[in-house]
Amino acid sequence: MQIITTALVCLLLAGMWPEDVDSKSMQVPFSRCCFSFAEQEIPLRAILCYRNTSSICSNEGLIFKLKRGKEACALDTVGWVQRHRKMLRHCPSKRK
């Protein structure tokens, strides 16, 4: 009887799961979005690597990983960003 009760509770909870949950972002935990972008050029010597923002983000750009443990976002359409991208390596994925 306890197994049936547990199964019913699980079904009820699953039915209450919101349907507007963004399942894509749950599948790609390493992805990130940018909401503000660097207005001035970041010196190339300060950047370790870059990665693209996720395709599910409203703003497409690059996330630069900086040497002091910080990150900065930049629009991929800006000239200096495109030049830096050609000179840098892509950041390794943190996925296991």
UniProtKB/Swiss-Prot annotation:
Stated induction or repression of this protein's expression: By phorbol myristate acetate (PMA).
Keyword Secreted attached: yes
InterPro entries, A to Z: Chemokine_b/g/d, Chemokine_CC_CS, Chemokine_IL8-like_dom, Interleukin_8-like_sf
Signal sequence region: 1-23
PROSITE patterns named in the record: SMALL_CYTOKINES_CC
A GO term for molecular function: CCR chemokine receptor binding
GO cellular component: extracellular region; extracellular space
Alphabetical UniProt keywords: Chemotaxis, Cytokine, Disulfide bond, Glycoprotein, Secreted, Signal
Location(s) in or outside the cell: Secreted
Keyword Secreted: yes
Quaternary data: Monomer.
Stated family: Belongs to the intercrine beta (chemokine CC) family.
PANTHER family on file: C-C MOTIF CHEMOKINE 1 (PTHR12015:SF5), SMALL INDUCIBLE CYTOKINE A (PTHR12015)
Protein's name in the database: C-C motif chemokine 1
Source organism (scientific name): Homo sapiens
Phylogenetic placement of the source organism: Eukaryota, Metazoa, Chordata, Craniata, Vertebrata
Underlying gene: CCL1
